[in-house]
């Protein structure tokens, strides 16, 4: 049991060294938690789920390494002992990842030997050989260990290994020195955690570079004696890619003073690599809790706090690793066109213009703000007067979408100058910059063109444009406005008074409307609004059942009245009042509620009975309620009335006294 506890401590120290290598070691809580998971026989997936909060991206590497170590110990324990004196050697080679300069793979060999006397000998040795290639060296290491089989105990969480009386000397080359014991009861067990530089093939790694090794220090070891040592190395500068080999060695001697600590570090590096930073930490004695288990702090709370801290750190670091892309809002139903598309359109038009014009064509490109203009002057065939070809393209940043229309370029004839309406739009250079930008889709009117005039078609298909949503009325209006705006410009450009004016063809994908054009459009809009009939500020008496809808000249309320029921306008109010529950049957003249059905009479009064002097002949026996004849009103005092001029009716038969009107039960004999 003592040896098993020592092996558990050795595994714990190796786990601690591995955590320090990954930079995830904080205190003893995490190694304790991992040892508990090992004791509970957690599978790699469960360990990866539980340790992902602590190790992050190194979780898979750690779990593969840990289960590789446990699998080796388990395979040694399960292997049956040999009956003969022969020694069975089983070697398992685990290739490690190659470095950037093509280092040799490291091989790990484990040999197990057993004797007839059921004695177990544990000896682990490793030697790091350096093979140089192009000024860089890697150290292939071979680990050989002879281990006695262990008895499986399902209830125990540690592995027991009985010590042998002596150790074997195992060497693979004359350079390797083995650790030999002069005492028969000494047991040497050493485990090393070798840290390697990550390579491109890190995804293929199936086992980590954990090895149990026996590293000798040569003849100096015999002078210093045998001491148990524990070493954990940590690379403080992660930018250095030098491999660091750290050995953790614990030696148990039966007749010596006890356990001692020694730092064993063998680092042989080339000039290409810098000196690796190393930190040697002596193993601390096992802490014993001073409080009973009932009063100790709950480890789950500590682990939860650590996980929350790690999660917050991951969140803060991930915010800066992922670049944030700024998104620019784009208007709906438009698509931002790249500069290449607009330049391609310009080049396409230029090529066709070169085909139509002579070689001495003058190219003059002007860029104003977001609009680019290409002006070409072409000499006339007969009159030798220059013809100006002007191409204006509004860039994508202004249009936010290219036009999908197809337009035709025609060479103007000498006899017939092209009409002014063939322009899509014009820009007055002397005016101020526009305050608003509007999309114009002017229709090219059908013109009779001779068959001899060449033409070519430039189409921009596949690009959505909001220009198609314009109505014909708007396009005609803007076409007329463009015509009026082009007239002054043509008068300024023409220097001759001949009947044949200078033809100019303006081809544009889109254009701006200047302030003058905007003012004219606004005036036309105002006139159109004034042409409509204004609604009268009076509530529609047929509302809410009015059939005219929005065309009704009267006001239809659409907002709740805020002063109801204290509104003094009643049914004349321009706001909505709740419906009256009596609706058309309501007889209240000033009812503030809304009546959906039309009331028959806003102030109904009952018809007064006709005043007739004819006394009903059936009086006072008449039973008809609405009898049109006169029924005298009886006097309340009846025969007791003492007024001589009483106008009420006094019946001739006296009314019996009150006592006579009382009913009494007849007594039965």
From Swiss-Prot:
Annotated Basic and acidic residues bias: 127-141, 192-208, 217-236
Regions of compositional bias (Acidic residues) in chain numbering: 261-273
Chain intervals for the UniProt region annotation (Disordered): 81-145, 175-298, 316-337, 460-504
GO cellular component, one term: nuclear speck
Family to which this protein belongs: Belongs to the ZC3H14 family.
Function: RNA-binding protein involved in the biogenesis of circular RNAs (circRNAs), which are produced by back-splicing circularization of pre-mRNAs. Acts by binding to both exon-intron boundary and 3'-UTR of pre-mRNAs to promote circRNA biogenesis through dimerization and the association with the spliceosome. Also binds the poly(A) tail of mRNAs; controlling poly(A) length.
UniProt protein name: Zinc finger CCCH domain-containing protein 14
Lineage summary: Eukaryota, Metazoa, Chordata, Craniata, Vertebrata
């Amino acid at each position: 049991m003592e040896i098993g506890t020592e092996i558990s401590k050795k595994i714990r120290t190796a786990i601690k060294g591995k955590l320090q290598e990954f930079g995830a070691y904080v205190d003893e809580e995490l190694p304790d938690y991992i040892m508990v998971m090992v004791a509970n026989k957690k599978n790699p997936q469960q360990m990866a789920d539980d340790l992902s909060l602590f190790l992050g991206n190194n979780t898979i590497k750690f779990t593969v390494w840990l289960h590789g170590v446990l699998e080796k110990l388990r395979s040694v324990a399960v292997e049956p002992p040999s009956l003969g004196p022969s020694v069975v050697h089983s070697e398992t080679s685990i290739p490690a990842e190659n470095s950037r300069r093509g280092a040799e793979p490291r091989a790990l060999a484990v040999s197990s030997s057993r004797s007839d006397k059921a004695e177990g000998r544990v000896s682990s040795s490793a030697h790091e050989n350096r093979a140089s290639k192009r000024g860089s060296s890697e150290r292939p290491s071979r680990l050989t260990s002879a281990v006695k089989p262990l008895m499986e105990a399902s209830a125990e969480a540690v592995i027991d290994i009985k010590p042998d009386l002596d150790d074997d000397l195992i060497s693979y080359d004359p350079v390797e020195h083995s650790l030999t014991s002069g005492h028969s009861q000494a047991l040497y067990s050493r485990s090393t955690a070798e840290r390697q530089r990550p390579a491109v093939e890190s995804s293929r790694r199936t086992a980590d570079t954990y090895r149990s090794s026996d590293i000798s220090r040569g003849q100096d070891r015999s002078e210093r004696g045998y001491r148990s040592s524990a070493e954990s190395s940590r690379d403080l500068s992660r930018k250095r890619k030098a491999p660091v080999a750290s050995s953790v060695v614990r030696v148990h001697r039966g007749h010596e003073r006890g356990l001692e600590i020694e730092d064993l570090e063998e680092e042989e590096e080339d000039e290409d690599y810098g000196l690796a930073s190393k930190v040697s930490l002596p193993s601390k004695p096992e802490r014993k809790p001073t409080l009973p288990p009932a009063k100790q702090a709950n480890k789950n709370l500590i682990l939860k706090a650590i996980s929350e801290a790690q999660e917050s750190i991951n969140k803060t670091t991930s915010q800066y690793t992922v670049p944030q892309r700024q998104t620019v809002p784009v208007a709906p139903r438009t698509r931002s066109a790249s500069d290449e598309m607009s330049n391609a359109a310009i080049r396409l038009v230029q090529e066709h213009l070169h085909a139509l014009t002579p070689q001495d064509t003058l190219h003059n490109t002007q860029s104003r703000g977001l609009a680019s203009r290409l002006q070409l002057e072409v000499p006339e065939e007969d009159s030798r007067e220059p013809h100006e070809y002007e191409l204006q393209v509004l860039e994508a940043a202004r249009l936010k979408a290219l036009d999908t229309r197809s337009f035709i370029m025609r060479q103007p004839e000498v006899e017939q100058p092209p009409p002014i309406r063939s322009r899509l739009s014009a820009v007055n250079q002397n005016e101020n910059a526009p305050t608003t930008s509007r999309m114009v889709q002017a229709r090219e009117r059908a013109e009779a063109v001779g068959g001899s005039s060449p033409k070519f078609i430039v189409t921009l298909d596949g690009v959505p444009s909001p220009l198609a949503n314009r109505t014909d009325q708007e396009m005609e209006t803007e076409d007329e406005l463009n015509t009026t705006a082009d007239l002054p410009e043509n008068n300024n450009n023409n220097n001759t008074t001949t009947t044949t004016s200078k033809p100019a063809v303006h081809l544009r994908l889109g254009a701006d409307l200047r302030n003058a054009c905007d003012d004219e459009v606004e005036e036309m809009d105002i006139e159109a609004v004034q042409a409509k009939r204004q609604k009268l500020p009076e509530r529609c008496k047929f509302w809410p059942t009015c059939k005219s809808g929005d065309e009704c000249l009267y006001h239809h309320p659409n907002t709740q009245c805020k002063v109801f029921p204290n509104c003094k306008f009643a049914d004349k109010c321009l706001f909505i009042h709740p419906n009256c529950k009596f609706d058309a049957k309501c007889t209240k003249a000033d009812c503030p509620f809304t009546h959906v059905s039309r009331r028959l009479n806003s102030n109904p009064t009952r018809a007064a009975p006709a005043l007739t002097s004819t006394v009903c002949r059936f009086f006072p026996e008449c039973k008809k309620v609405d009898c049109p004849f006169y029924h005298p009103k009886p006097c309340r005092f009846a025969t007791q009335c003492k007024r001589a001029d009483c106008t009420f009716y006094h019946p001739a038969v006296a009314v019996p006294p009150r006592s006579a009107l009382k009913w009494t039960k007849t007594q039965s004999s």
